[in-house]
Amino acid sequence: MSHPRWFGAALLAALAAVASLAIVAASGAAGPPLPKSSNGNPVEVVGTGVPTPTAFAFTGSTVFAGSGPNEETNGPGGLFTVADRKATKVPNTPPIVFGLAWQSDKLYVSTGPSIVALEGWDGTAFSKETVIFASTNKKFAGFNGIAFGPEGRLYAGLSLNPKYDHSQNPYKPSQAVVSMTAAGKGMRVVAEGMRQPFQLNFPKGSKYPYVTVLGQDKGGKAPNDEIVVAKPGQNYGFPTCTWILPKQEKACKGFDEPAIFLPPHSSPMGIGSIGNTLYVSLFSGTGKGPEVVEMSTKGQPRPLLTGFAAPVIALGVNQGSIYVGDLTGSIYKVAAK
């Protein structure tokens, strides 16, 4: 991958292990088999051909899908619209996308080292691109997912520099969730002590983002993956505390406990919500392969979609349906209820 420090060492390692499986799964003439829903609702293919899907955004009937670097060709991904079982590249847009958020008739895009705002959408292309935040400091690990809070500030998870996979990154800000104005001003740290906060979502009525956090993959006993509710001033302990209890009970004293623990290596990626129900894509799953789970804001995940041909990354919610993208490049949709 061309930008490993922006996308995360944990995901890189997993992608390398499963890339060949994704190729095989996608190579059939009929495409990969459809995942199965636990609620009995049909799963449909919205589009195909989105390499390494990372995020979704929606406006009207338009579905935007962001894409990271192409894992098979090492070429760029970018921004696509998906409809009628195909993906269409949006011209003159960033070649790599890690997060998307639609707000006030603008599409905000996390490209890694920068966040840009696209406006003037005519159904095919945007007429204007504005860089609202960009870092030229090579020590800045970059941005992952983004989401707008109810007060209008833009929140972002910061990417992992793999050099600090088990240690504190001395560069500030890092290993944190940050927020800024819609114009990219006044960036400040919201919460810290997270190895790699990936995607964010504000459930109905929540002032704070629910954030998927990827735990360590190597070096001793693997800690649980996490979902945190990033409240101002909180510190979730990384790297001093990775919540391996009771072993780390003393080390974790004084830190803020994550809201939800998930099994090690389950790798929570995308996150969305309908009311107080969370929907989370698990890259590796809880033991039976990649899956999408649903749970209350207090946890207790249960399967919603299983049987994917390849690991899942992107997840979004729109008009009562769950959208998910896997490494075959396929985008699926299923009604939540």
Question: Residue spans of the language-model regions?
Answer:
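Beta-propeller domains
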Residues: 64-84
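Short loop/turn segments immediately following the C-termini of beta-strands
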Residues: 68-70, 112-114, 120, 159-161, ...
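Bacterial N-terminal signal peptides
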Residues: 11-23
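A short beta-strand motif characteristic of beta-propeller blades
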Residues: 42-48, 86-92, 130-136, 186-190, ...
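Bacterial N-terminal signal peptides that target proteins for export
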Residues: 1-13
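Asp-box/WD-like beta-propeller blade repeats and closely related beta-sheet repeat scaffolds
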Residues: 113-148
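Beta-rich, blade/repeat-based domains predominating
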Residues: 49-62, 93-106, 110, 137-154, ...
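Beta-propeller domain segments
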Residues: 31-37, 143, 160-188, 194-302, ...
